[in-house]
């Protein structure tokens, strides 16, 4: 199984605590697929909403494919996500009752098909973000101090 990651949403890991991850297919036009293969995608401000029993990806920027300018697409249009009905109902229930949100984490190709990894997430408060940054800095310092001392 070959996976080629096109885009990751680093801001989602900073702003949210990730609870559960799901893999979803995505409905795209031909020019969008070609643009994705070039790596022209941005997930920074994107989010997932469930409307009428269907999952939709909003604000995902996929740059227009230059050679197909004649048949171009809207770069930030809403795109349908392909999930099983059980998964959609499960996500819908959790989002309604607990105040959670669904965010896309990365876009990638798996066996030639475009996929989106989405996650059920809970927003972090400012002090939680600071704690996470301090923890990351401490890990980095520890690794740096051990780097020169361990020899095999």
Curated annotation (Swiss-Prot):
It is found in: Cytoplasm. Pfam families: SmpB (PF01668). Gene3D superfamilies: 2.40.280.10. GO terms for molecular function: RNA binding. CDD domains: SmpB. Disulfide bonds: none annotated. Keywords: Cytoplasm, RNA-binding. Signal peptide: none annotated. GO terms for cellular component: cytosol. GO terms for biological process: trans-translation. Its main location: cytoplasm. Belongs to the SmpB family. HAMAP family: SmpB. Required for rescue of stalled ribosomes mediated by trans-translation. Binds to transfer-messenger RNA (tmRNA), required for stable association of tmRNA with ribosomes. tmRNA and SmpB together mimic tRNA shape, replacing the anticodon stem-loop with SmpB. tmRNA is encoded by the ssrA gene; the 2 termini fold to resemble tRNA(Ala) and it encodes a 'tag peptide', a short internal open reading frame. During trans-translation Ala-aminoacylated tmRNA acts like a tRNA, entering the A-site of stalled ribosomes, displacing the stalled mRNA. PANTHER family: SSRA-BINDING PROTEIN, TMRNA-BINDING COMPONENT OF TRANS-TRANSLATION TAGGING COMPLEX. This is SsrA-binding protein.
């Amino acid at each position: 199984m070959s996976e080629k990651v096109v885009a990751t949403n680093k801001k989602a890991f900073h702003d949210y605590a990730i609870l559960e991850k799901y893999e979803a297919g995505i409905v795209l036009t031909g020019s969008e697929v070609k643009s994705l293969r070039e790596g022209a995608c941005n997930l920074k401000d994107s989010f997932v909403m469930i409307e009428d029993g269907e999952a939709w990806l909003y604000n995902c920027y996929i740059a227009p494919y230059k050679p197909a300018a004649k048949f171009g697409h809207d770069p930030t249009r809403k795109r349908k996500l392909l999930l099983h009905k059980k998964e959609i109902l499960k996500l819908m229930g959790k989002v309604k009752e607990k105040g959670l949100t669904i965010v896309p984490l990365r876009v990638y190709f798996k066996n030639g098909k475009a996929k989106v990894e989405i996650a059920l997430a809970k927003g972090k408060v400012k002090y939680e973000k600071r704690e996470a940054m301090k923890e990351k800095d401490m890990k980095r310092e520890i690794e740096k101090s051990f780097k020169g001392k361990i020899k095999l």
